[in-house]
Amino acid sequence: NNIKKYSNKIYEILKIIKKSNGIVLIYSQYIDSGIIPLALALEEMGVRRYKDKNLFKKDQLKNNNIDAITMEERSGDNFNQCCYSIISGNVKLSPNKKEELSILTDKTNKDGSKIKIVLITRAASEGVDFKNIRQVHILDPWYNLNRTDQIIGRGIRNLSHCMLPYKKRNVS
């Protein structure tokens, strides 16, 4: 709840993500002042990192967990926790990049049930084909419109939404 005091942009993105019906792509060229604060905010909200250690220490996290499909808080063992992934050029921050890209684009993840949110840096802004992206958020200022178009193009690709029902073949 306090994130709004420090970053209204991250606060608004988190509000929109909670209403998401599919995979969410978020771009920032900044790691220390973009991707990491956003990842920490996601963890605080109840989203865990896919297969890697969370950036927060475990005892600092609240006991709230977000369901990957409904995006509602859940507890217990009978739900599928929402996960995020970081795709960057930094090996320490993205040690399993190839595996996570494979899961992200797999047809079993078309609804985000395995990885719901993908945070990308400039390293993934060109040459990577994502599938079934339903939302694209750009955290950075719009100083470079060509870069912005490239990032939006990661989520809107020819035939990238064909596994989804017709009414869900859109990106916001």
Question: Which residue stretches match the model-derived regions?
Answer:
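Conserved helicase/translocase motor-coupling segment
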Residues: N1-L40
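Short, solvent-exposed loop/turn segments at secondary-structure junctions
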Residues: G22, Q29-G34, M45, V91-K92, ...
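Structural motif
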Residues: L25-Y27, I117-L119, H137
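Conserved helicase ATPase core of P-loop NTP-dependent helicases/translocases
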Residues: D52-R122
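A short beta-strand element within the Helicase C-terminal
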Residues: D129-P141, Q150
